[in-house]
Swiss-Prot record:
Signal peptide: none annotated. Keywords: GTPase activation. One of its GO terms (biological process) is early endosome to late endosome transport. GO terms for cellular component: early endosome; late endosome; plasma membrane; transport vesicle; tubular endosome. This is Putative uncharacterized protein DDB_G0284213. InterPro entries: UPF0507/Ank_repeat_27 (IPR051248), VPS9 (IPR003123), VPS9_dom_sf (IPR037191). GO terms for molecular function: GTPase activator activity; guanyl-nucleotide exchange factor activity; SNARE binding. It comes from the Eukaryota.
Length: 702
């Protein structure tokens, strides 16, 4: 199906940006060559390029044309356009259309496969791109949008590649003065200052945006298109934030210093968890290799700043070394001269020449070494990608997600998988995937990066895919905060080491949720001198410190195994049977209860054993004088069991003289005694037979 030329970027640019050229084509019935839309990728449409695509037919030769700028001659033959001087260069004609002007005279539009001049080098024009993808790469009317809005690309766009460079230079000279004054007067000392800092910075951005649109006629034509204005705003934002990056990011690092340390320590623990523990499906594991490499660039901007500082230090050290070497050489020369004062002048001259030669050789070697060091440092800087703007950090997350999608597509094509069997990234998968990539990247200033991206992306991006990835980044960091710190294997190992006789801990993770921050706060208070761990021993020390802080918390008791529950039930049954037959001999003893013990401190297995004939629950098992040794052991076991899960210390020991009996051997017999005297004999007989049992006598008088 042929392309609709009314939506072609090249054709629209000629009509709106170069109307004089288009009127000339219509009025004089020239031929216009229009490259197809996929071939316009990264093409800067200038007036010279437009004139090279306007053909004027020769008066003397058929099918021979001259361009409007008089620079080239072309021949149209057998569906191709060829240069007259070079027949090897051919451009295929896709289709042509015949149009009419207001005087009903015809002129010709030819759609060609690729531009005759000015196209992107090395671009395969056969690669088709949808119109939406093209809109993300280009701003209409000939203004190219940088693929990655870094500070360098924004500077090149406004001050180097733009047609109206002189006008933009005047605007940005004024903007640089405003930014220097802003950087001198503003600082971030508290979290409330962040909003004021952003508000004032947004005013500068909007004012500079208005100045550019008013001063530049090319930008003024974009004012009616919101999407194009957002793209221009994004480039301008990269320039502004690149200018004040050192000031802004440095203040945010100091403000979120504790949060950065807490998140960094937590990510070290979480990096040892499996995919399932973090919530990532194991199917995504083979598709995360390139994504991890992309997310590693999340800290590159910080490394770049550090490298610059290191280079300055290296240069200073090299200069100092040269100065010291020269001083040493001069001292050696003076010493040699003093020693050789008694020797003739010829020998002195020879020695001085040798010393000078040696000094020159040493100095040359030092200079060569310094040059090599500087070259190595420069090479290292060139290899590091500079990440400065918040938008550039966000694009690292976007690129990581795209790498996963591309890996899934490539594997599906390789395995010839059906569409229903292809792995897809849903909204539920994107959150843990982003969290997993951040955990393994271990950014040292993650809390700062969160504030940097969420607060200082000045352009409205929430109606685009960038907005989705920003929300996903914020949610992923919150997800990291809510994840369990301890892996299942560590939880079981630590519990077994601390209590050899304790029941086996459940291997399910305990999610602390909102208490995760307080956990790290306790750890940082107890270990204020702790540093960022870099070795396995440091990580183990951090883990032990964290385990100590967990011991002060009241956690729910882990579930016991079935074998241990059965053993406890058998012990309870044996103890109850021994108490059933010993209570009758001790009915007259004093009975005291320790009512101060709350029932919820007793184990769950014992708290539900209520007597079926009384309303008082059995808080703990009875002690009998005949079974003191057995019962004391059981009580000690119960005390140990209770102390595992209780943060309060209390005593459940009962003296030997105290016997607790609140159980009947069997249900008491009830004898009804009425006012009828005939039943008195029966009552006495029954009472004589049941003298050893508990008896309740009820009376009812008519």
């Amino acid at each position: 199906m042929d392309e609709d030329l009314n939506h072609n970027l090249f054709f629209k640019t000629i009509k709106f940006k170069f109307p004089k050229i288009f009127n000339t084509i219509e009025s004089k019935c020239y031929t216009l060559c229009i490259p197809q839309s996929p071939s316009l990728y990264r093409m800067n449409i200038t007036q010279k390029i437009v004139e090279s695509h306007v053909f004027i037919e020769s008066k003397y030769y058929q099918s021979e044309y001259e361009t409007l700028n008089k620079e080239s001659n072309y021949i149209i033959d057998n569906g191709y356009i060829m240069e007259k001087e070079n027949n090897n260069k051919k451009v295929k004609i896709m289709f042509d259309e015949l149009c009419y002007n207001k005087d009903y005279k015809s002129y010709r539009l030819i759609c060609i496969e690729e531009p005759l001049t000015g196209g992107a080098s090395g671009l395969n024009s056969s690669i088709s791109r949808s119109e939406s993808d093209l809109g993300d790469l280009l701003i209409t009317q000939g203004i190219v949008k940088p693929q990655r809005p870094t500070f360098d690309q924004a500077t090149q766009f406004f001050l180097l590649d733009s047609i109206s460079t002189n006008i933009n230079t005047i605007v940005f000279r004024k903007a640089n003065q405003q930014l220097e004054e802003f950087e001198r007067l503003h600082s971030i000392n508290s979290k409330t200052d962040v909003d004021f800092f952003r508000k004032d910075l947004l005013l500068i951005h909007n004012r500079l945006m208005d100045d550019l649109v008013c001063a530049n006629a090319d930008f003024k034509q974009l004012h009616s298109n919101e999407k194009q204005m957002n793209s221009l705003s994004l480039i301008l934002e990269s320039y502004i934030l690149g200018k004040i990056q050192n000031k802004l990011y440095g203040d945010l690092k100091r403000l979120y210093e504790k949060e950065n340390q807490h998140l960094y320590e937590k990510m070290i623990y979480l990096s040892k968890l499996s995919f399932e523990d973090i919530g990532v499906k194991s199917d995504f594991e083979p598709h995360l290799t390139k994504a991890k490499e992309v997310i590693e660039s999340f800290n590159t901007g910080i490394n770049y700043i550090n490298n610059n500082n290191n280079n300055n230090n290296n240069n200073n050290n090299n200069n100092n070394n040269n100065y010291n070497n020269n001083n040493n050489n001069n001292n050696n020369n003076n010493n040699n001269n003093n020693i050789n004062n008694n020797i003739n002048n010829n020998i002195n001259n020879i020695n001085s020449n040798n010393n000078n030669n040696n000094n020159n050789i040493n100095n040359n070697n030092n200079n060569n070494n310094n040059n090599n060091n500087n070259n190595n440092n420069n090479n290292n800087n060139n290899n590091n990608e500079i990440i400065i703007t918040p938008m550039d950090k966000l694009l690292s997350i976007v690129q990581g997600s795209r790498e996963i999608e591309e890996s899934i597509k490539a594997r599906a094509i390789l395995e010839l998988a059906d569409e229903d069997d292809i792995l897809t990234i849903t909204g539920d998968d994107a959150l843990p995937l982003t969290a997993y990539l951040l955990i393994h990247a271990r950014p040292k200033y993650l809390a700062t990066d969160l504030a940097y991206c969420s607060k200082f992306i000045l352009t409205d991006i929430f109606n685009s895919s960038y907005g989705y990835h920003l929300v996903n980044l914020i949610a992923a960091i919150d997800y990291i905060k809510s994840l369990d710190i301890l892996s299942p294997t560590k939880t079981t190992t630590s519990s077994n080491n601390s209590r050899n006789t304790s029941p086996t801990s459940s291997t399910t993770n305990i999610t602390y949720g909102g208490n995760s921050e307080s956990l790290f706060a306790q750890s940082s208070v107890n270990n204020s001198t702790i540093s960022s761990p870099k070795q396995p021993e440091d990580e183990a020390a951090l883990f032990n410190n964290l385990k100590k802080s967990l011991s002060t918390m009241n956690l729910n008791p882990p579930q016991q195994s079935q074998q241990q529950q059965q053993q406890q039930q058998q012990q309870q049954q044996q103890q109850q049977e021994s108490n059933f037959y010993s209570n009758n001999n001790n009915n007259n003893n004093n009975k005291t209860f320790n009512n101060s013990i709350p029932p919820h401190f007793i184990s769950n297995q014992n708290s539900n054993n209520n007597n079926q004939f009384t309303s008082t629950p059995n808080l703990f098992n009875n002690n009998n004088n005949n079974t003191n040794s057995n019962n004391s052991n059981n009580n000690n076991n119960n005390n140990q069991h209770n102390s595992r899960y209780s943060t309060m210390s209390f005593s459940t020991n009962i003296s030997n003289n105290t016997n607790i009996s609140n159980k009947y051997v069997k249900a008491p017999a009830v004898i009804s005694l009425d006012d009828d005297s005939d039943n008195l004999g029966d009552f006495i007989g029954k009472l004589r037979d049941m003298r050893d049992d508990e008896v309740i006598v009820s009376t009812h008088f008519k």
